[in-house]
Amino acid sequence: MPLSQTAMRFAGHVAYHEYEGPAFNRAERERLIADLGNRNAMILRNHGLLVCAPSIPQAFNLIYWLEQACKIQVDILSCNRPLHLPTTDVVEGTSEALSGMEITLDNEASTNPALKDGAQKAGSGYGLLEWPALLRALDRQDPSYRD
């Protein structure tokens, strides 16, 4: 539901898959692929979230913000008050605007030399600027994840 700007990023870009029990059935793979289609985010009903992305930073960003959108929706619905939904034009415009805001690190590296090495490795997309900072925080907290 487009109840927040965060959720509007995903408007029309989320697939859904019905819960089929624990994923032991290999035949479910084909149904998951079919349900996902050309989208990169999926809500597995009564189960959880699934995302696909060309890089780990992009996948992390996608799952993080999809989860935030879901949390906001749960919070709003738990208020048991009438919903105020934006118009379709606003939802579509916001979704389109946010879809076009992906960061290209090559462009960022031209103004911030510290990003040059990361830019060459990462490419472009959401999450690429945040990812090095998240790894530095993890290195400080518990560097054993690299082993």
Question: Which residue stretches match the model-derived regions?
Answer:
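Glycine-rich flexible loops
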Residues: 1-147
